[in-house]
Amino acid sequence: FGSLLGICLLTQILTGLLLATHYTADTTLAFSSVAHTCRNVQFGWLIRNLHANGASFFFICIYLHIGRGFYYGSYLNKETWNTGVILLLTLMATAFVGYALPWGQMSFWGATVITNLFSAIPYMGQTLVEWAWGGFXGDNPTLTRFFALHFLLPFIIASLTLIHLTFLHETGSNNPLGVQSNCDKIPFHPYLSSKDILGFMIMLLPLMTLAMFSPNLLGDPENFTPANPLVTPPHIKPEWYFLFAYAILRSIPNKLGGVLALAASVLILFLMPFLHKSKQRTMTFRPLSQLLYWTLVANLLILTWVGS
């Protein structure tokens, strides 16, 4: 899935650059500039739909990639694993600030609710939120800085990816048995290159299908309404890939507790290398660990479903 993530990043940066050329980061113009891109720009609708749904595929790939790393004990390559978790956090930040850009109802309220979580930090919380917003509510300064961040972060992701790969290159890749694979090395081309191209096709075909036939399947209809600070949508919820964390946040009555649990649900990944106590690296021959692993997967799916 690593190669798929690379292709995702490339696609997102390309479509994103094309979108940025037609986008205006101003509260009065942002919504109509996106509408203009979809209506009047050559293939603007396709570029926008590919960019929006590409994010979903990016998250599908990264969750599968992490799950695979979990199952086969890849977290024992500590540097690779830690840079990977940092990559995940950066990706989440990028997706969050990007979702605010069309400045629809859900964009505005999602941004408001999530940035508001910083106010749970004792003493300095409220000041921090107002500093992040650039005012007393999400407004023009908020949108412009979110656009700047959304433009910058993917390039940071790209550079972190290089670091991630450099660390991986130190140890070489892992395999389902968790044994040395030096004797199994084969030329990259034509073997692995064709495997990668097959993966690209298997991913890009559903992406194109989704973008062409039902581009709004995963989006929220609230976002077709321009942002209005005076009207709160009936149910504020993030895109599906954040629902598990959002469900954790909302299930805890205390604000600070919820924020800590939300952060912990992702940051727990940093602890994985220290929690490995088995003599075997992978879960291939560890039925009990497998049971716990699939329980975790089921939990995440249930949380995602409950969060919606």
From Swiss-Prot:
Parts of the chain that traverse the membrane: 1-21, 45-66, 81-101, 146-166, 194-214, 256-276, 288-308
Subunit structure: The cytochrome bc1 complex contains 11 subunits: 3 respiratory subunits (MT-CYB, CYC1 and UQCRFS1), 2 core proteins (UQCRC1 and UQCRC2) and 6 low-molecular weight proteins (UQCRH/QCR6, UQCRB/QCR7, UQCRQ/QCR8, UQCR10/QCR9, UQCR11/QCR10 and a cleavage product of UQCRFS1). This cytochrome bc1 complex then forms a dimer.
Keywords: Electron transport, Heme, Iron, Membrane, Metal-binding, Mitochondrion, Mitochondrion inner membrane, Respiratory chain, Transmembrane, Transmembrane helix, Transport, Ubiquinone
Cofactor(s) annotated in UniProt: heme b
InterPro entries according to UniProt: Cyt_b/b6_C (IPR005798), Cyt_b/b6_C_sf (IPR036150), Cyt_b/b6_N (IPR005797), Cytb/b6-like_sf (IPR027387), Cytochrome_b_C_euk/bac (IPR048260), Cytochrome_b_N_euk/bac (IPR048259), Di-haem_cyt_TM (IPR016174)
Any single Gene Ontology cellular-component annotation: mitochondrial inner membrane
MF GO annotations: metal ion binding; ubiquinol-cytochrome-c reductase activity
Coiled-coil portions: none
Additional remarks: Heme 1 (or BL or b562) is low-potential and absorbs at about 562 nm, and heme 2 (or BH or b566) is high-potential and absorbs at about 566 nm.
Function, in words: Component of the ubiquinol-cytochrome c reductase complex (complex III or cytochrome b-c1 complex) that is part of the mitochondrial respiratory chain. The b-c1 complex mediates electron transfer from ubiquinol to cytochrome c. Contributes to the generation of a proton gradient across the mitochondrial membrane that is then used for ATP synthesis.
Entry's localization field: Mitochondrion inner membrane
Record protein name field: Cytochrome b
Binding residue positions for heme b b566: H65, H164
